[in-house]
Amino acid sequence: MFSISEVDKSDSDLALLVSELDAFLSELYPAESNHCLDLSTVSDEQLRCIIVRDEGGIPSGCGALLFLKDGSAEIKRVYIRPEYRGRKLGEQIVSTIEIIASEQNLPLLRLETGIHQQPAIALYRRCGYEICDAFPPYEADPLSVF
């Protein structure tokens, strides 16, 4: 059984998961196409973070919701540790983020992922997301999917 809870952006387990995600992404993409969000650069009011833990309390995955100035929000930092993949945790993370967005009456959720992350693209499609054009602050990037 897994649990999902909201955590502060400075949570040490969240920092560990995000560092694993950053290392993974740096192997896939050059720096100019690596759109990682440094959580410490975002105010607490702009960000909500969640973490998934296994039955032993071990951090298994994470995600975040970044509130944008135009009144929409972006799904960020979705990551599942490799040993926990294939258990529908991605769907649970996205669903939890969507609940947070709904509670904030956000009219639109967006996201960016990379072309080399086919499982992530498949996850977002299963969750009902469709490919669209780049949105601010992004510019079109052949290695990104929006």
Enumerate the language-model features and the residues they cover.
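C-terminal "cap" of GNAT-fold acetyltransferases
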Residues: 2-3, 7-10, 107-110, 114-146
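Residues that form or flank phosphate/diphosphate-binding pockets in enzymes
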Residues: 60, 88, 119
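Active-site acidic-Proline motif in GNAT/NAT acetyltransferases
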Residues: 81-83, 87, 115
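Acetyl-CoA-dependent GNAT
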Residues: 2-76, 81-83, 94-96, 100, ...
